[in-house]
UniProtKB/Swiss-Prot annotation:
Part of an enzyme complex containing four subunits: a flavoprotein (FrdA), an iron-sulfur protein (FrdB), and two hydrophobic anchor proteins (FrdC and FrdD). Interacts with SdhE. Residues 577-598 are annotated as: Disordered. This is Fumarate reductase flavoprotein subunit. It is an enzyme of class 1 (oxidoreductase). Its main location: membrane. The gene is frdA. It is a peripheral membrane protein. It catalyses: a quinone + succinate = fumarate + a quinol; a menaquinone + succinate = a menaquinol + fumarate.
Length: 598
């Protein structure tokens, strides 16, 4: 086993990982940084984000407005000091990306263009056509190449982190190209491994988004927080889960049922706004949890359209015109044509909700550090407390760079103040990781990782979907317990060294099963409806601030199901209130202004 000595190790080279690496390199030019990724950086899942990144930029917008939209959108489960820090940091990061070369779309006068996203009452989403994630990731990757102290380990799969005397001290990874192991020692480690959307059958996530970082931190005793909150995006393509960006609706797209009716006006997001009126009043720009829930009700009422790929509604962009679609949503036109054979210029796009984003994750403090000294987390794998029970669109790309920078700066400080590690203890841990890998490779079993993964995805969709019941969640919990037992009998049939995906998918599945259990156990024990967690059981259909205005913490239990604890939500300036959108929000805004003016 090779050994590489670094000061800081970063697991994941997407938006958060690259931003952390750049921040660390700028904080201390002498710092030796190891950047480990199981794919080439430009294949990280950040590249798939289409819509945009939030930051206050207009005169009629403010940090307070962004703060209010985020806290209300998260159904008051956000850590409000974290949200405050976030909204004030976003403009700096967007400007920094521009200075590094990110080609933000612009208005005719040359100023940065912004569009509105769901749940945001003011246009504040910066975008680069409909390939924002690609351009942000490319900009960060290009910028990272300026720093020779950042050493990349592309196509290296991290097997485990090393912890000595209560501090993260490195990791062990497998070089996928050669099949050899490498021990990377460091005084601090940052997890930037993305979410866990692949635990669901249909999802918008790339194949690499399997919850690896969450699973590793979890098994080392770090709790996973608020894992019951999994966002369904309302506009995925049927069958594939390919995302039709929220930017479609931000540009003025509408959603209709089989009767051509803009049905969202029946679910607290109306009244109907005539086409061509200010888009920030469009009912289609409600928060994602509520828009996805409206689809479920339309389906139950028989007002969706049946297709071979499942029931759908339509996303209609035709009234925007060919010129605007080709200029502002060119990638969407390509995707719709390629995956469902639809030209958005001429016909509506069939869509349905699909699993999209993990609001919960590795619990961290405001500096992105976990309960293990020197172990940090940033991006979708983390739970710093920003999103609460429902993330607003375009806050996630901004989160990557805001908290990627914070994690990089604080991990640098932690690394520099740390005493030397116990090398022999790290070597012993690394040998243990190697032995576990060999045991897995030689395991004589009868189970297939692919079959277990498929059954997990179906079960999670049935029990932990848009609407949940005790009965369905319990079935999912029972199924997951069965699958974890069967996982102990998985047989790896490929024993080659080079790009052994049979082995890698098996290891990923182990993490996914742990994460899925945390999601389901956290969900069945939250006996209320809040944000993306909606229950149909009697007594659980409403938000319950008295008993459940708190975070769920899932701790690893080697003997079975995760152990749950709860912690308070930090409320600093916006007390819990009813979430209102559409006409009801307009009426409240008018009333607030009248009261303010006496």
């Amino acid at each position: 086993m090779q050994t590489f000595n670094a000061d800081l190790a970063i697991i994941g080279a997407g938006g958060a990982g690259l931003r952390a690496a750049i921040a660390a390199a700028e904080a201390n030019p002498q710092l030796k940084i190891a950047l480990i990724s199981k794919v080439y950086p430009m294949r990280s899942h950040t590249v798939a984000a289409e819509g945009g990144s939030a930051a206050v930029t207009q005169d009629h917008d403010s940090f307070d407005f962004h703060f209010h939209d985020t806290v209300a959108g998260g159904d008051w489960l956000c850590e409000q000091d974290v949200v405050d820090q976030f909204v004030q940091s976003c403009p700096r990061e967007m400007t920094q990306l521009e200075q590094w070369g990110c080609p933000w779309s612009r208005k005719p006068d040359g100023s940065v263009n912004v569009r509105r996203f769901g749940g945001m009452k003011i246009e504040r989403t910066w975008f680069a056509a409909d390939k924002t994630g690609f351009h942000m990731l490319h900009t960060l990757f290009q910028t990272s190449l300026k720093y020779p102290q950042i050493q990349r380990f592309d196509e290296h799969f991290v097997l485990d982190i090393l912890v000595d005397d209560g501090q993260a001290r490195g990791l062990v990874a497998i070089n996928m190209m050669e099949g050899t192991l490498v021990q990377i020692r460091a005084n601090a480690v940052i997890m930037a491994t993305g979410g866990a959307g692949r635990v669901y059958r249909y999802n918008t996530n790339g194949g690499i988004v399997t919850g690896d970082g969450m699973g590793m931190a979890f098994r080392h005793g770090v709790p996973l927080r608020d894992m019951e909150f999994v966002q369904y995006h309302p506009t995925g393509l049927p069958g594939s889960g390919i995302l039709m960006t929220e930017g479609c609706r931000g540009e003025g797209g509408i959603m209709v049922n089989k009767d051509g009716y803009r049905y969202l006006q029946d679910y607290g997001m109306g009244p109907e706004t005539p086409l061509g009126q200010p888009k920030n009043k469009y009912m289609e720009l409600g928060p994602r949890d509520k828009v996805s829930q409206a689809f479920w009700h339309e389906w139950r009422a028989g007002r969706t359209i049946s297709t071979p790929l499942g029931d759908v509604v339509y996303l209609d962009l035709r009234h925007l015109g060919e010129k605007k679609l080709k200029e502002r949503l060119p990638f969407i036109c390509e995707l719709a044509q390629a995956y469902v054979g639809v030209d958005p210029v001429k016909e509506p796009i069939p869509i349905r909700p699909t699993a999209h984003y993990t609001m919960g994750g590795i619990e961290t403090d405001q500096q992105c550090e976990t309960r293990i000294k020197g172990l940090f987390a940033a991006g979708e794998c983390s739970s710093v407390g920003l999103h609460g029970a429902n993330r607003l669109g375009s806050n996630s790309l901004a989160e990557l760079v805001v908290f990627g920078r914070i994690a990089g700066e604080h991990a640098t400080q932690r690394s520099l103040e740390s005493a030397p590690a116990n090398a022999s203890a790290l070597d012993a841990q690394a040998r243990d990781v190697e032995q576990r890998l060999h045991t897995l490779m030689k395991q004589e079993g009868t189970e297939s990782w692919a079959k277990i993964r498929d059954e997990m995805g179906i079960s999670m969709e049935e029990g932990c979907g848009i609407y949940r019941t005790t009965e369905l969640m319990q079935k999912t919990l029972d199924k997951l317990a069965e699958l974890k037992e069967r996982f102990k009998r998985v047989k790896i049939t490929d024993h080659s060294s080079v790009f052994n995906t049979d082995l890698l998918y098996t290891i990923e599945l182990g993490h996914s099963l742990d994460v899925a259990q945390c999601m389901a156990h956290s969900a069945i024990n939250r006996k209320e409806s809040r944000g993306a967690h909606q229950r149909l059981d009697e007594g659980c259909t409403e938000r319950d601030d008295v008993n459940f205005l708190k975070h769920t913490l899932a701790f690893y239990n080697p003997e079975g199901a995760p152990r749950l604890e709860y912690s308070d939500v930090k409320i600093t300036k916006l007390p819990p209130a009813k979430r209102v959108y559409g006409g009801e929000a307009d009426a409240q805004e008018k009333s607030d202004k009248e009261q303010a003016n006496g």
